[in-house]
Amino acid sequence: MKITAKLTFTLLLILFITHGAAEERPIRIKAVGDIMLGSYHPEGFLRPDEKGSILNYIRPVTQDADITLGNLEGTLCDSGLTDKCEPDSLDCYVFRMPEIYGKDLKSAGFDFLSMANNHIGDFGSECVTKTEETLDINDIGWSGRPGTYGSKTIRGVDIAFIAFHSGGYCNSSLDMETAESLVSNLALDHDIVLVSVHGGAEGLAAMHLPDSTEYYMGED
């Protein structure tokens, strides 16, 4: 079975807070949305090993930047159980990618990845921790759990990355006071702060934001 990658855009906000750049040439940033490279669950949704990395096709694009970031829509975890979906469900999805795919993300040029989304907890806290460890091993900055952020110095510029989602297990996009405090504190020690927000309803009926609280599938 031929497996293709689909990188879809989520709501991504990039906030620049500068205190004097180390060089005159601008920092070039590229961002993609949801990244899901195949899943152990259900069976049969992993790429054939002999095909090589599915990211090979986009590597020339994602490598061509000073900073590349995206939203990791699932865990990097070789084992783990889930009770999120019924066994025969056709409208419930859980994603668990092999840990080895962390190397593919690194070779594709990703510097920061958001773990603040509705699929990072599909296989429980152990797989969240394993994903964090896998990204650390591959020197990819990440942000997800409350209070977490990534930090790198690139071309002499100190850069922070923080990600938000409406779920209670992430930096909350609904708690604006805390979000503002987190970003402001990062700005004190960094030249650039990148802010990623994963949220919003999907589908044709959600093309315009309401002037009120938005709900999707029962969630705020």
Where do the model's predicted regions map?
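Intrinsically disordered, low-complexity Ser/Thr/Pro-rich tracts
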Residues: M1, A21-E23
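Bacterial N-terminal signal peptides that target proteins for export
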Residues: M1-T8
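Hydrophobic h-region of N-terminal signal peptides that target proteins for export
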Residues: L12-A21
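Acidic, metal/ion-coordinating pockets
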Residues: E23-D220
